[in-house]
Amino acid sequence: MKTFTAALLVGTALAAVPQQQPLQTQVEDSAWAKPLEDLKDTIKSMGAEAKQAWDQLASAFPDALNEYTLFSAPKKHTRRPDSHWDHVVRGADVQGIWVDGVDGQKHREVDGKLENYDLRVKAVDPSKLGIDPGVKQFSGYLDDNENDKHLFYWFFESRNDPKNDPVVLWLNGGPGCSSLTGLFFELGPASIDKNLKVIHNPYSWNSNASVIFLDQPVNVGFSYSGSSVSDTIAAGKDVYALLTLFFKQFPQYAKQDFHIAGESYAGHYIPAFASEILSHKNRNINLKSVLIGNGLTDPLTQYPHYRPMACGEGGYPAVLDESSCRSMDNALPRCQSMIESCYSSESAWVCVPASIYCNNAMIGPYQRTGQNVYDVRTKCEDGSLCYTGLNYITQWLNQKPVMEALGAEVESYDSCNMDINRNFLFHGDWMKPYHRLVPGLIEKLPVLIYAGDADFICNWLGNKAWTETLEWSGRAEFASAEMKNLTIVDNKSKGKNIGQVKSHGNFTFMRLFGGGHMVPLDQPEASLEFFNRWLGGEWKA
């Protein structure tokens, strides 16, 4: 199992694509709520084909079921009294607001089941942390009181024109990794150096947008719960509630355009979260677009591109030898067959074996080389996450003055929670076809898929492939569209070629040169360039 552990943390990691259908209603796999012993009993009682898959899995990876737990242990925490916070927004109060419709009939001001949610808000004093002095900041928790879930967020106003600039929600992936990683390691207003000093980031995405960094799902980062979330659809309900209550507290931001951006496993999150928002007719969330960077969205189409990327066909020298490349080729047909079965059933009993087999067969050979799965140009620096700098962030966030300034309620901060990662994996969420939600988004708003071209785990070859095979009304035109040079247009680097872009209607794909899994880390100037231009509406129908 250790052959693919790292890939399941920060990242995620041309097939014939069957006719795409909307993502099915969540499958009820009740056995997953049982103790592990009962789960094994359930496997024994399954049908022959499914049992064979699990038997083969157990034979190939004998420690798998013993090593993995299905639920995350609650994080130690102490909830602060309401008096600690500047504002507490009650979901029940928001749900109780009725307004007159255009037809003269009364309806709720905002839709959704909100009565069990609260939002706690406090102003963050930038002078105490040394981050973006003069920029208004808020932090706090979204509380799901019925299910004992508490999601932490940190909001930064735009450095430029917060009264008019758009608002962006940023999501890191994993699943199970804190979005504060994105804040301090990629696109936020500051980074942390080896001496735990705060370093200003001139290329922060809040240069021309206000940004919310959210630790989700629960038990990630500063978030905590007595329960657990183990699939993307369930997490989407929490995000809708957070945004609804946040914009109710701050109506000045609700007037601005709103966008959702993220990377890696956010390729699952964002189609589901955006679809959840759009499903509510009466809402105060002015969603205008979504951006997915180096995401895992359509595994069936993306997994065949691990071998080319590892074997020198993605624009960089080969990492693997010919023997390993042939081994991946040989394993691919079975991997694809298992993913196809997962797409058909969306059951954990089918999707979990597909995840474990394919990750070991298609990602494992690369990982065993010690090369960075997030950047084919480098070796892993430190531990499973490959970047020593992540340790500095964790150390800084675990300082008591920092936690006090933010109102954090957990005893300690971790950049990634492996239990959450395993929960999603062992509930079958990893391989599910969330790309089937994307056509519905394209009909209503612009969708950007961008990819740093040095990433292995969610590489640009696979992302380009799934965008070109996606079933939607403009598929043929998008697939045949030319990849054009993407150059910087409005600063001292004007004319610099930073990548390639193709677009048709509301759908756009970008390849960013020299970027790894985390494009803003490797190419900060280029990332801010395309981000600002995207928010400005340069690529849309």
Swiss-Prot record:
Catalysed reactions listed for this entry: Release of a C-terminal amino acid with broad specificity
Propeptide: 18-122
Residues forming the catalytic site: S264, D455, H517
GO molecular function, one term: serine-type carboxypeptidase activity
A cellular-component GO term for this protein: fungal-type vacuole
Disulfide bonds listed in the record: C177-C416, C311-C325, C335-C358, C342-C351, C380-C386
Signal peptide start and end residues: 1-17
Subcellular location: Vacuole
Glycan-modified residues: N208, N485, N491, N506
UniProt keyword terms in alphabetical order: Carboxypeptidase, Disulfide bond, Glycoprotein, Hydrolase, Protease, Signal, Vacuole, Zymogen
GO biological process, one term: proteolysis
EC number annotated for this UniProt entry: 3.4.16.5
SUPFAM superfamilies registered for this protein in UniProt: alpha/beta-Hydrolases
Similarity comment: family membership: Belongs to the peptidase S10 family.
Task performed by this protein: Vacuolar carboxypeptidase involved in degradation of small peptides. Digests preferentially peptides containing an aliphatic or hydrophobic residue in P1' position, as well as methionine, leucine or phenylalanine in P1 position of ester substrate.
PANTHER family tied to this protein: SERINE CARBOXYPEPTIDASE CTSA-4.1 (PTHR11802:SF113), SERINE PROTEASE FAMILY S10 SERINE CARBOXYPEPTIDASE (PTHR11802)
Name of the protein in question: Carboxypeptidase Y homolog A
Natural source organism: Uncinocarpus reesii (strain UAMH 1704)
